[in-house]
């Protein structure tokens, strides 16, 4: 269930290392953990940043994976 999709970061708390992405297809917001961010720099996201990601079912429901800033 890891098809690539795009969306905008709804919010991200860099101190806690998680936030939510709003998919562009109108589906439900998706949880994102900093460990899913593909970056060699500090792994953080900013509000309204466009990202590409996949979705996998985690222990607490759907979660973004392989998150890449566009």
From Swiss-Prot:
<keyword id="KW-0963">Cytoplasm</keyword>
<dbReference type="InterPro" id="IPR012340">
    <property type="entry name" value="NA-bd_OB-fold"/>
</dbReference>
<feature type="domain" description="CSD">
    <location>
        <begin position="7"/>
        <end position="67"/>
    </location>
</feature>
<keyword id="KW-0805">Transcription regulation</keyword>
<dbReference type="InterPro" id="IPR019844">
    <property type="entry name" value="CSD_CS"/>
</dbReference>
<dbReference type="InterPro" id="IPR050181">
    <property type="entry name" value="Cold_shock_domain"/>
</dbReference>
<dbReference type="GO" id="GO:0009409">
    <property type="term" value="P:response to cold"/>
</dbReference>
<protein>
    <recommendedName>
        <fullName>Cold shock-like protein CspI</fullName>
    </recommendedName>
</protein>
<dbReference type="GO" id="GO:0003677">
    <property type="term" value="F:DNA binding"/>
</dbReference>
<dbReference type="InterPro" id="IPR002059">
    <property type="entry name" value="CSP_DNA-bd"/>
</dbReference>
<keyword id="KW-0010">Activator</keyword>
<dbReference type="InterPro" id="IPR012156">
    <property type="entry name" value="Cold_shock_CspA"/>
</dbReference>
<keyword id="KW-0238">DNA-binding</keyword>
<keyword id="KW-0804">Transcription</keyword>
<dbReference type="Pfam" id="PF00313">
    <property type="entry name" value="CSD"/>
</dbReference>
<dbReference type="GO" id="GO:0005829">
    <property type="term" value="C:cytosol"/>
</dbReference>
<dbReference type="GO" id="GO:0003676">
    <property type="term" value="F:nucleic acid binding"/>
</dbReference>
<dbReference type="InterPro" id="IPR011129">
    <property type="entry name" value="CSD"/>
</dbReference>
<dbReference type="GO" id="GO:0010468">
    <property type="term" value="P:regulation of gene expression"/>
</dbReference>
């Amino acid at each position: 269930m890891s098809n690539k999709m795009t969306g905008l970061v709804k919010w991200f708390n860099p101190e806690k290392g998680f936030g939510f992405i709003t998919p562009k297809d109108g589906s439900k917001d998706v949880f994102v953990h900093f460990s899913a961010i593909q970056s060699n720099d500090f792994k953080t996201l900013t509000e309204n940043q466009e990202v590409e990601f996949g979705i996998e079912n985690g222990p607490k429901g759907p979660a973004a994976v392989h998150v890449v800033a566009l």
